[in-house]
Each structure stands twice: as structure tokens, then as C-alpha cells.
Swiss-Prot record:
It is a single-pass type I membrane protein. The modification Phosphoserine is found at residue 384. It holds the Pfam family LRRNT_2. Residues 304-576 form the Protein kinase domain. ATP binds at residues 310-318, 332. Residues 1-28 form the signal peptide. Its EC number is 2.7.11.1. The active site is at residue 427. It comes from the Eukaryota. 'Fei' means fat in Chinese. One of its GO terms (molecular function) is kinase activity. This is LRR receptor-like serine/threonine-protein kinase FEI 2. It is found in: Cell membrane.
Length: 589
């Protein structure tokens, strides 16, 4: 009897174990689990976090980065920010129909946003910024009636902004800045109330939100349906051809009339395009070696127009200001900040104006007007390093590149170690390294990030403006240190050596940025391939030293990065003939 009872117990135990295993297997392959595994299988690389997702696990709710509803056990949040994810977004994500929060920003995801994401009707927040996502914004996102936050900034999106997004009545935050979007910004619903900050960095957008008028041909056409229904319709082509004939006659008449008006009124139209400095404007000069009266400077300011623009950036428009005695200055216009901020702004400018160093662009003074601040800097005829590397026809030889790197390092090191108070730049990039007539580098725009950090618009611009140069921890926390500058400097060195932008298209195709590309080449023992093929006179020993320094600077761990003082020491001892006294040269050329 005991033996029979034991056999029955064993049979029941085996049956219960089998049913339990079957239940666990069914849980592991739930629709939500399958969707997440499809995402995992499509990712080509990561820091290992999603490698812990196992199909045999009984519950995907225990997976890293996954949050489930306590009662329904459905996935409600997927948060995998800054985990070095490289790969496409699979359409299976659309099966997570209870998903409320999708946070995949600060990775290396690419290809397009799946239209199936529009099936996740419970979504309240989509954060895909700082990736390499291409294609158009799916119009299906307009179906997400509960969506509150949508951030697609710092990607490679193209096409028009779908008008369907204007239907999102609960949307409070929207950011598509720094992409390649084109056409007219829809003026439906919330989209009509958004400011310029949501769209910065898309050169071919137009609309009242960014104060750019759309023309009838081109931009407004690009803002049509993103589904591409325009096509080469024969009737449209016929109408277009007929309209062109009449249009040419109209253009000829307009040109004739325009020339007549220009002779009469043209010069009046270009006056005071920069700013009306009358009525309470004052000039503050920091260095006593400028022999100009305030009225002379103000007179020159009033004559500036769009023909004098030499650059535009996240901090403002830059104009070329020529004085009667032949001296030339660069004038940076910063729009008036919030009321009550003037005193702090002026105090900080006094600090910046006291800094003089061979490898920094001198701030000579500023004009305080009722509507804006106009900062007066030394003008450097060599333009920016960005222009020299990527936009001009001439090629920088090896010696010029090395000297530029060393000069930029010395300027940044001076800000970190010899200024009181110390200055963290936060926006080191090639367009902020200016060159004089001898191609000697000077760091510009230092201190401006701190001046404007309390402005919401600036925070958006600074992060967007330096995308590709930003240290990982800065993108994650928003907290800048000297080591975030060191990382950006390391990226700058790689840019100078390679002649490629940090987010060059050749990297994006492989899911890299310039740092990822370097790491890949190092793993393949091909680091030398990073050098620009057009660069002449490359010295192998100097190249090895520069690659070693750059690799240290772009370490993912801030603690492993050298200080800029140490970087200068390495450059002087391993790349050039040591001349340490030059580092502390605070004289201005």
C-alpha cells in the first residue's frame, strides 16, 4: 500500500512539474516577450544588458529595462538609455499595445521608426533622441491620442513633419531639432503654438513657428503628405509646364520693377537689420587699447545688415564689423534674456573680458541695448576649423593639423587650470576653434554656456549643437565637468586626424559615431586608417602619439580621461619639441 501511494505521489509530482514547466514556457513566449526578443535579436551590439534577456525566462517583466503592470503583467515601459544599442527598431515593437513609455535615447539605433508604433495607443512618452534614425516621421504617431512627450531630436530624419501630429491634444513637449526635415511646419493644433526651439537645426524647414516664410515652390510642396502621393502625375506636369511660361513673364516684370525699386529704396531696406541700438544703448570696453568712442561704435552697429553676417550658431548670429581705421572685429548678437538676468550676465562678461591668452579669442567689450547683447570679439581671418576641414577647397597638411590640435589644447587647459574661477567650455567643437592668418588655433565661445544655461532654449541648443562631441555622462545627466570638455577635445582630435565630421554618413551607415569607428578600427588593428588620405606629410610617431592621446580622452569613464593640463604635457613631450613655458603664455597677439 505504501509503495502504491508513493508511486501515485511521484506521478502527481511529475504531472504538476510538467504543467508548471509548460506554464512557464507559455509565459516566456507571451506576445510582449516575443516583441522584446525580436528587438533583442535585431540589435547588432550593446553593452550586454539585453543579452540577459532569455527566451526561457518565465517572465519578461524581470528583464533589465522592462517594467510591467503589477496586475496585468503587461509591458508598460521600456527604458534602455545609453546602453550602446546598435541596430534597427523592429516593427514588432508595435505589438506592445500597453506600452506607456519608450526610452531608447542616447544609443546608436538606426534605420526608420516603424509605423507600427502607432498601434501602441497607450504611449505617453517616446524618447528616441541622440541616435542615428533615418527615414520619415510616421504619420501613424498621430494616432497616439495620449502622447505627452515626443523627442526625436539629434537624428537623421528627413521628409516633412506629418500634419497628423497636430491632432495630439495632450502633447506638451515636442522636439525634432537637428535632423534633415524639410517643408512647411504644419500649423494644426499644438504644432501652431510651438517655438523655434522644437525645430532648430533643420535648415529646410519653414513656417511661422521659426519666423521663416515658405515660398510657393519647394518648401510648401515639401510640407505635403509624407506618404509621397505627389509623384509625377502627368496632369500636374502639364499644369506645371503651362504655369512656367506665364511665370517667366511675371518674373521678368518683377526683376525690372525690383531693379528700379532697388535703385530708389534698396539701401534703406538694409539699414538697421541687426538691431536698433538707439535709446539707452551703452558700450562697455574691457581693454583700454581700443581708441574708439562709444558713438563711433554705435554708428557702425547701425550700418550692419545681412551682408555682414559671417556665421550663425547656437548662441547667436555673428557679424563682421569694420572700423574706419581698418581694424576688424567679430560681433556676436545674443537676444535679450529674461528680465532681471542683466546683472548676472554683465558680471560674468566682466570675468570673461578679463581673460587674455594667446590661444583664446579675446572678448573686447559689449553693447548693452534694449533688445539684445552685442559681444565684440577679435576677428580672425582664417575662419573656423570646421570650415578649413569640411567646407573649403584647400587641404590642411600634417604640421598645420598638429599645431591646431596643440593650440586648442593649450587654450582649453588655460580655461580649466589657470582661470579664476575655472571655466568649463561645454561646447568644444571644430566650429568653435577659430584660426588666424597663420592657421594658429584659438578657442572661442568659452563661458557662454554658463551665461545662458538658465534659458530653456539654450539648453536645447547646446546639447543639440554639440551632438557627436558630447561625453556619454553629459548626455545622460546634463552635468558638465572638465572631463566632459576633455571628451569633446578627444573627438575634435579624431575629427582633425580623419577630416570627417563626428557624425559622418559613413559612420551612421554602420551604426557608429567617430568614437565608435575608432574603437572598431583599434579592435581590427587598423587604427592608422583613421588618417585623412588627403593629408600630406604624416609622421608615424606623431600619429601614434595623437591616437593614444585621443583614445584616452574619449574613454567612456570620466575618471580614466586625463586632465587638459596632462594632455598638453603629452602633446609637448610626445608630439612636438617640448616648450612648456608656452602653455602659461597669457599674452595676446
Amino acid at each position: 500500500m505504501g509503495i502504491c501511494l508513493m508511486k501515485r505521489c511521484c506521478s502527481w509530482f511529475l504531472l504538476i512539474s510538467f504543467l508548471s514547466a509548460l506554464t512557464n514556457e507559455n509565459e516566456a513566449i507571451s506576445p510582449d516577450g516575443e516583441a522584446l526578443l525580436s528587438f533583442r535579436n535585431g540589435v547588432l551590439a550593446s553593452d550586454g544588458v539585453i543579452g540577459l534577456w532569455r527566451p526561457e525566462d518565465p517572465d519578461p517583466c524581470n528583464w533589465k529595462g522592462v517594467t510591467c503592470d503589477a496586475k496585468t503583467k503587461r509591458v508598460i515601459a521600456l527604458s534602455l538609455t545609453y546602453h550602446k544599442l546598435r541596430g534597427p527598431l523592429p516593427p514588432e515593437l508595435g505589438k506592445l499595445d500597453q506600452l506607456r513609455l519608450l526610452m531608447l535615447h542616447n544609443n546608436a539605433l538606426y534605420q526608420s521608426i516603424p509605423a507600427s508604433l502607432g498601434n501602441c495607443t497607450a504611449l505617453e512618452g517616446i524618447y528616441l533622441q541622440n541616435n542615428y534614425i533615418t527615414g520619415t516621421i510616421p504619420s501613424e504617431i498621430g494616432n497616439l491620442s495620449g502622447l505627452k512627450n515626443l523627442d526625436l531630436s539629434n537624428n537623421n530624419l528627413n521628409g516633412a513633419i506629418p500634419a497628423s501630429l497636430g491632432q495630439l491634444k495632450r502633447l506638451t513637449k515636442f522636439n525634432v531639432s537637428n535632423n534633415f526635415l524639410v517643408g512647411k511646419i504644419p500649423s494644426d493644433g499644438l504644432l501652431a503654438r510651438l517655438s523655434r526651439d522644437s525645430f532648430n537645426g533643420n535648415r529646410n524647414l519653414c513656417g511661422k513657428q521659426i519666423d521663416i516664410v515658405c515660398n510657393d515652390s519647394g518648401n510648401s510642396t515639401a510640407s505635403g503628405s509624407p506618404t509621397g502621393q505627389g509623384g509625377n502625375n502627368p496632369k500636374r506636369l502639364l499644369i506645371s509646364a503651362s504655369a512656367t511660361v506665364g511665370g517667366l513673364l511675371l518674373v521678368a516684370l518683377m526683376c525690372f520693377w525690383g531693379c528700379f525699386l532697388y535703385k530708389k529704396l534698396g539701401r534703406v531696406e538694409s539699414k538697421s537689420l541687426v538691431i536698433d541700438v538707439g535709446g539707452g544703448a551703452s558700450i562697455v570696453m574691457f581693454h583700454g587699447d581700443l581708441p574708439y568712442a562709444s558713438k563711433d561704435i554705435i554708428k557702425k552697429l547701425e550700418s550692419l545688415n545681412e551682408e555682414h553676417i559671417i556665421g550663425c550658431g547656437g548662441f547667436g548670429t555673428v557679424y563682421k564689423l569694420s572700423m574706419d581705421d581698418g581694424n576688424v572685429f567679430a560681433l556676436k548678437r545674443i537676444v535679450k534674456l529674461n528680465e532681471g538676468f542683466d546683472r548676472f550676465f554683465e558680471r560674468e562678461l566682466e570675468i570673461l573680458g578679463s581673460i587674455k591668452h594667446r590661444y583664446l579669442v579675446n572678448l573686447r567689450g559689449y553693447c548693452n541695448s534694449p533688445t539684445s547683447k552685442l559681444l565684440l570679439y577679435d576677428y580672425l581671418p582664417g575662419g573656423s576649423l570646421d570650415e578649413a576641414l569640411h567646407k573649403r577647397g584647400e587641404q590642411l597638411d600634417w604640421d598645420s593639423r598638429v599645431n591646431i590640435i596643440i593650440g586648442a589644447a593649450k587654450g582649453l587647459a588655460y580655461l580649466h587650470h589657470d582661470c579664476s574661477p575655472r571655466i568649463i567650455h561645454r561646447d568644444i567643437k571644430s566650429s568653435n576653434i577659430l584660426l588666424d592668418g597663420n592657421l594658429e588655433a584659438r578657442v572661442s565661445d568659452f563661458g557662454l554656456a554658463k551665461l545662458l544655461e538658465d534659458e530653456e532654449s539654450h539648453i536645447t541648443t547646446i546639447v543639440a549643437g554639440t551632438f557627436g562631441y558630447l561625453a556619454p555622462e553629459y548626455m545622460q545627466s546634463g552635468r558638465a565637468t572638465e572631463k566632459t570638455d576633455v571628451y569633446s577635445f578627444g573627438v575634435l582630435v579624431l575629427e582633425v586626424l580623419s577630416g570627417k565630421l563626428p557624425t559622418d554618413a559613413s559612420f551612421i551607415e554602420k551604426g557608429f559615431n567617430i568614437v565608435g569607428w575608432l574603437n572598431f578600427l583599434i579592435s581590427e588593428n587598423r587604427a592608422k586608417e583613421i588618417v585623412d588620405l588627403s593629408c600630406e606629410g604624416v609622421e608615424r610617431e606623431s600619429l601614434d602619439a595623437l591616437l593614444s592621446i585621443a583614445t584616452k580622452c574619449v574613454s567612456s569613464s570620466p575618471d580614466e580621461r586625463p586632465t587638459m593640463h596632462r594632455v598638453v604635457q603629452l602633446l609637448e613631450s610626445e608630439v612636438m619639441t617640448p616648450c612648456p613655458s608656452d602653455f602659461y603664455d597669457s599674452s595676446s597677439d
